[in-house]
């Protein structure tokens, strides 16, 4: 008591008095609550000691601040708490003088009170005396809940049955002598909110029995209509007769109408960044500088290590994905074509020398990731076209003729030695999937020319022979492609001499061999009835074959020239039939 200076008495009750004091050292005002123990029942004494112990343990921004407590001469329990300059809520209601509070302010107060009660209920504490005179306002009009003289600590979620509190704020279950729990505080808070909203008590009567009847029946006058329906519904939900139907403090804080205010309070209550006094700024700055120096040192060591690793990797011939632009300036200045050519040469050499397993067993192309390693794996296959373009025409022709994407029925691989065929197969596996998967193969057929008749690599006595292919889907596609080429050429056949080899497509048709006898056999004389009969017979046989295999689309294309209004349809179809029969189809 010697540390405080008494300024004035600000309150008095049946159990004691409240004094406004000033701390002699801090020069800050506090409230000294003196609870008289003399001439009091044992229950009142226990209540005073309980309040002293409880208020010392409670720490919440919306509960009155605890400063100190002691027992003076065995006659008084002294509790020093924070001083609220704004007074209590009952005084604020009187000062309002029938001027309603704004809904925003009431919602803010409600959220603060709910946070205080939720803190107490989580810690199994019942206030049991929530009323307007125990709700205090700070200088900034913020809420502080006080007076824990009737509070009770429960060991768990048990209920209590003691009849304590202010009658006009008592809940129906307490008046009915039914055990009650934390929902009794929600009822009392609803009565406070009703009074703060309507500026009059929720339940008022001249005698105790009438008050009990009104509370038991939960008879309430309507709330002012200036407030929103959601806000009025919140207050009504807190004043429901059954405690099971009342929401808890935590549930009310989750109500959508109160969420903006909850968020605002959470932002305000976040800890400030500059909480250190001025005397510690020098030491903090020194620590920060030391930390920055250590971080920069470790970071520089990491960068040096990366550069060293990249240099070692460069010397060993392995590309590094962690290098910087400064380390690779010379590499970036080098033309991309040279880089791709070098990489392709290296990969092809490895493949030819026997390192086939890494190429042939590589997985299918997957979606490109952020790392650079998959990108390097795919580069050889993408750049192989550029490398192949630099080879001599004769070699390029042979290599392309052996690829499965050629879609020609000429068995060029029969002309190659086993060594050349093996190399061609390996190079074919390196081909990019863009040729055979992503792009139409029909468009790629024109890019694979047949070796010229004067090619030095071909044996002079060896002739290209036409072998009848098997009836498969691949041969079907080849026949279809050949059919389209021959059809475009045959349209020119009617405007010129039909015996001209250039008109018959000898330059572009991959089915033409190097034999002069074969060229003579390919010529079709329209005046020869024998050849026309053979052509028609071949047309019927081929049509029946397509019909038997249910290849109706190709059958429709074959019979389309026989439609009405076509220019020389019969000659075209007969010539095509002759061609198909000559190929063994």
UniProtKB/Swiss-Prot annotation:
UniProt-listed SMART domains: S_TKc
Pfam families hit by this protein: Pkinase (PF00069)
Binding site for ATP: 10-18, 33
Protein keywords: ATP-binding, Kinase, Nucleotide-binding, Serine/threonine-protein kinase, Transferase
Active-site positions on this chain: 129
UniProt xrefs under PROSITE patterns: PROTEIN_KINASE_ATP (PS00107), PROTEIN_KINASE_DOM (PS50011), PROTEIN_KINASE_ST (PS00108)
MF term (GO), any: protein serine kinase activity
Tissue: Expressed in pollen grains.
Composition skew (Polar residues), residue ranges: 400-413, 498-511
UniProt KW Kinase keyword: yes
Enzyme Commission code(s) on record: 2.7.11.1
Reactions performed catalytically: L-seryl-[protein] + ATP = O-phospho-L-seryl-[protein] + ADP + H(+); L-threonyl-[protein] + ATP = O-phospho-L-threonyl-[protein] + ADP + H(+)
Disulphide-bridged cysteine pairs: none
Annotated Protein kinase domain residues: 4-258
Region Disordered, residue ranges: 354-413, 489-511
Similarity field: Belongs to the protein kinase superfamily. NEK Ser/Thr protein kinase family. NIMA subfamily.
UniProt-listed PANTHER family: SERINE/THREONINE-PROTEIN KINASE NEK (PTHR43671), SERINE_THREONINE-PROTEIN KINASE NEK3 (PTHR43671:SF71)
Known partners and oligomeric status: Interacts with PLIM2B.
Misc. comment: Expression in anthers at the tri-cellular pollen stage is down-regulated in cytoplasmic male sterility (CMS) rice lines.
Known role: May be involved in plant development processes. May function downstream of DCW11 in retrograde signaling from the mitochondria to the nucleus. Seems to be involved in the mechanism of cytoplasmic male sterility (CMS) occurrence.
Protein name as catalogued: Serine/threonine-protein kinase Nek3
């Amino acid at each position: 008591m010697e540390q405080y200076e008494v300024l004035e008495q600000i309150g008095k009750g049946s159990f004691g008095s409240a004094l406004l004091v000033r701390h002699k050292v801090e020069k800050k005002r506090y409230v000294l609550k003196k609870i008289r123990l003399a001439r009091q029942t044992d229950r009142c004494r226990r209540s005073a000691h309980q309040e002293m112990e409880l208020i010392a343990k409670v720490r919440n921004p919306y509960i009155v601040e605890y400063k100190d407590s002691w027992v003076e001469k065995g006659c008084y329990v002294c509790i020093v708490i924070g001083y609220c300059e704004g007074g209590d809520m009952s005084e604020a209601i009187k000062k309002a003088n029938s001027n309603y509070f704004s809904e925003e302010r009431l919602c803010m107060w409600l959220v603060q009170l709910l946070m205080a009660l939720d803190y107490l209920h989580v810690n199994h504490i019942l206030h049991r005396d929530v009323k307007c005179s125990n709700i205090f306002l700070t200088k900034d009009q913020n809420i502080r809940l006080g007076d824990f003289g009737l509070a009770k600590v429960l060991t768990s979620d048990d209920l209590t049955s003691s009849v304590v509190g202010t009658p006009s704020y008592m809940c129906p279950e307490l008046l009915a002598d039914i055990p009650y729990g934390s929902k009794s505080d929600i009822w009392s808070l609803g009565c406070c909110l009703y009074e703060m909203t309507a500026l009059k008590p929720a339940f008022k009567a001249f005698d105790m029995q009438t008050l009990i009847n009104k509370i038991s029946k939960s008879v309430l006058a309507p709330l002012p209509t200036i407030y929103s329906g959601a806000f009025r519904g919140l207050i009504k939900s807190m004043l429901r007769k059954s405690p099971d139907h009342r929401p808890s403090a935590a549930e009310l804080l989750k109500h959508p109408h109160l969420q903006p205010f909850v968020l605002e309070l959470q932002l305000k209550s976040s800890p400030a960044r500059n909480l250190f006094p001025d005397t510690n700024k020098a030491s903090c700055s020194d620590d920060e500088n030391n930390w920055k120096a250590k971080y920069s040192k470790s970071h520089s060591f990491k960068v040096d290590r990366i550069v060293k690793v990249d240099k070692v990797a460069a010397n060993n011939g392995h590309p590094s994905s962690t290098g910087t632009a400064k380390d690779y300036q010379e590499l970036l200045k080098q033309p991309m074509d040279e880089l791709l050519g070098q990489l392709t040469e290296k990969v092809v050499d490895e493949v030819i020398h026997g390192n086939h397993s890494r190429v042939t067993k590589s997985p299918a192309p997957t979606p490109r990731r952020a790392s650079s390693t998959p990108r390097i794996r795919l580069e050889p296959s993408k750049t192989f076209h550029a490398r192949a373009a630099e080879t001599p025409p004769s070699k390029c022709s042979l290599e392309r003729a052996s690829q499965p994407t050629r879609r020609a029925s000429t068995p060029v691989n029969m002309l190659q030695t086993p060594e050349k065929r093996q190399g061609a197969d390996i190079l074919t596996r390196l081909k990019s999937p863009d040729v055979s998967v992503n792009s139409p193969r029909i468009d790629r057929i024109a890019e694979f020319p047949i070796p010229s008749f004067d090619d030095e690599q071909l044996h002079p006595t060896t002739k290209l022979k036409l072998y009848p292919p098997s009836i498969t889907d691949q041969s079907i596609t080849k026949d279809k492609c050949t059919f389209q080429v021959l059809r475009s050429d045959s349209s020119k056949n009617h405007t010129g001499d039909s015996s001209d080899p250039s008109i018959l497509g000898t330059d572009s048709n991959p089915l033409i061999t190097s034999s002069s006898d074969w060229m003579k056999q390919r010529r079709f004389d329209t005046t020869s009835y024998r050849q026309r009969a053979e052509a028609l017979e071949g047309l019927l046989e081929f049509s029946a074959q397509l019909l038997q295999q249910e290849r109706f689309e190709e059958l429709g294309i074959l019979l389309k020239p026989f439609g009405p209004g076509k220019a020389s349809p019969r000659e075209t179809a007969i010539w095509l039939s002759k061609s198909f029969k000559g190929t063994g189809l």
